[in-house]
From Swiss-Prot:
The keyword Isomerase does not apply. One of its GO terms (biological process) is lipopolysaccharide biosynthetic process. GO terms for molecular function: glycosyltransferase activity. Keywords: Glycosyltransferase, Lipopolysaccharide biosynthesis, Transferase. The keyword Transferase applies. Pathway: Bacterial outer membrane biogenesis; lipopolysaccharide biosynthesis. Belongs to the glycosyltransferase 2 family. This is Protein RfbJ. Pfam families: Glycos_transf_2. The gene is rfbJ.
């Protein structure tokens, strides 16, 4: 259903070199028609290079803070549908097509996903409940 839409997966990042390639590849697998954008916020590791090597379009955001990055993402990327995910592999990319189809089918402005509580201590990091 979503294949005729311009979909952008936008990923704010700071020091996510260990997880970013998996995140990019998972979303490329689950939404093959989407464009993947990584917005690096002054990482001191190789996040930007790893993301580029994985096939993402990488933007550098020099102003510190996730708020600055989010504003830049929505300003710099033109798409019909935006899917914003974190670069630390905490969201299941296989849920994305269902969420996008739900958005389109029901003519919604926004759909918000959330990790499910499953008893796993790693579901939510401390301070993220």
């Amino acid at each position: 259903m979503y294949h005729s839409f311009n979909i952008a997966v936008i990923i704010p990042c700071y020091n996510e070199q260990k997880a970013i390639a998996k995140v990019i590849n998972d979303f490329k697998t689950n939404i093959p028609t989407a464009s993947i954008y990584v917005f690096d916020n002054n990482s001191t590791d190789s996040t930007a290079q790893v993301a580029e090597d994985a096939g993402a379009t990488v933007h550098s955001v020099p102003l510190k803070g996730k708020g600055n990055v989010v504003r830049r993402m929505f300003s710099d990327v033109d798409a019909d549908i935006y899917l914003m995910v974190d670069g630390d592999d905490t969201y299941d990319a296989s849920s994305a097509p269902e969420m996008i189809n739900h958005l389109i089918k029901n003519q919604l402005d926004m759909v918000v996903g959330c990790r499910q509580e499953n008893g796993d201590q790693n579901t939510y990091r401390k301070g993220h409940r």
